Amino acid sequence: MITMPDYRPGMNGIIIGLLSSFGSAILIGCFFLIFYFFRCTTSGRIFLDRIGRPGEYDDEQQFLREEAEALETMDDMQRTEYLRAKAFIAANPPESLQTDISLSQYLAIQEKGVSAWEFEPELEIANCFVEARTEIEFFDSECTVMSNLPVPKQNEVYYWEAKIYDKPENTLISIGMATKPYPLFRLPGFHKYSVAYLSNGTRRYNQPFNATSYGPQVVQGDVIGVGYRPRSGTIFFTRNGKKLEDVVHGLKSQNFFPSIGANGPCIVHVNFGQAGFVFIEANVKKWGLAPMTGSLAPPPPYGSEQGSILLEAGTKDGFTSTLGRGRGYSHPVQTYSRQGLAAVDSSHNRTRSGNFRMFPPTSPGPVRSPTDISLAHLVPTEDAGEPSSSAAALVDQDGQPITGGFLSPDQPPPEYTSPVNSRPGSRRHSSDSENTPLIQLSGRSRGASSATARPIQSGGSHNRPRAGSHRPPSPPIPSYQDAVRQGAGRDRSDSTRSARDSS
């Protein structure tokens, strides 16, 4: 009788399970090997990193192949411009300049806020004009303008917008960011390292040959936004407040500058954050390049403090006045010629009007008179030029001075009467009084009166009599005709004395 060996069903199950597991793993591995073999051997590309991006050497080889194909299709002008840009990049490699924000630039940003950013056109190209820091006007040839400061990297996202104010149909506009140095005679996005959204609806990233379809075409009135995430190195675009897909990732180490270029006439206005964004999320999260206002305080308003001077000198009737400083306010000084006024006393100055008082101004600027008569000091000069209309009234046609006022002798002032008598030293003798007469009599009779004007003394508010003059307690005030007659008599006496001295 034949005996069968002992049958153990448990052991057989374990063996079958192990074989099936190893077989499945081997089968899956074979599929991966086949996929990897065909994926890596196609088009000669070699994967050198863990996420499937090609290596630098393979990128250069691919770029050289694209360059050779593109040069065959370019015309002479395009080929010349491309070779010129290639030579510029070879002489000035990207990021060869120190473009990090320096301490002085950081302090300027703290003081000015977003106003620290502005576009700087290249003077050698001179094919665009920048007005009010962020308003750019392009002309007839290809040109790019970049900002003076790079985009910071402290916050999570930085964002800015550009509005197309004027754009002809045949003008191509490129809006994006690039590193310095960059060939400014080329558009952004065409060379390394630069990213741009073009007005024909395409995008470019380090690509001078083939553009990639990206979004709608840009027309006049559209607003294109550019966003940058420093932590991930991501750059994205928006159009009229709607976010488009991300363009590039991994650009963390580069310092990007906002850049705008065009190949024809157009006008673009840029908003770095000095106004509200069309993209609502950027407004809510405050994605601007810097705060709207910095720590630099504005200047105080004029006139808020005592002694503020807005204008120290001016002109009236074609006459330029010189400046004489007073206490806390300006005081103009006028000059007149000595010709025809040799007999006039140098102290005969009209210093104020009868209905005008000199007070410190409550608002900045020179003190104005309610009359047309000049209230400025009359300073004699040898050649002061042509006098003003107010100064010319001091001399009549015969060259005789008018000591009683600024009017002519044939037209006396109306209702000129003497005030009532008062004690010496009273308020009527003060220069601040409104009733003080402009002409005082100095120890002469009414028939031979000598009218003398008293100038305002700078040392005090009261006028003092001359030494040697005897003032009666209540001197009479000469009439207008007496003052004119006395002035003519003084002229005759002076002429007689001068003739006697000459003989």
UniProtKB/Swiss-Prot annotation:
The keyword Membrane applies. InterPro entries: B30.2/SPRY (IPR001870), B30.2/SPRY_sf (IPR043136), ConA-like_dom_sf (IPR013320), SPRY_dom (IPR003877), SPRY_Ssh4-like (IPR035780), Ubq-SigPath_Reg (IPR050618). Glycans are attached at N200, N210, N349. Residues 81-277 form the B30.2/SPRY domain. One of its GO terms (biological process) is protein transport to vacuole involved in ubiquitin-dependent protein catabolic process via the multivesicular body sorting pathway. The chain crosses the membrane at residues 14-34. SUPFAM superfamilies: Concanavalin A-like lectins/glucanases. Residues 342-372, 398-503 are annotated as: Disordered. PROSITE patterns: B302_SPRY (PS50188). Keywords: Endosome, Glycoprotein, Membrane, Protein transport, Signal-anchor, Transmembrane, Transmembrane helix, Transport, Vacuole. GO terms for cellular component: endosome membrane; vacuolar membrane. Residues 35-503 are lumenal. Residues 442-451 have a biased composition (Low complexity). It comes from the Eukaryota. It is a single-pass type II membrane protein. It is found in: Vacuole membrane; Endosome membrane. Residues 1-13 are cytoplasmic. Residues 488-503 have a biased composition (Basic and acidic residues). Belongs to the SSH4 family. Components of the endosome-vacuole trafficking pathway that regulates nutrient transport. May be involved in processes which determine whether plasma membrane proteins are degraded or routed to the plasma membrane. This is Protein ssh4. The gene is ssh4.
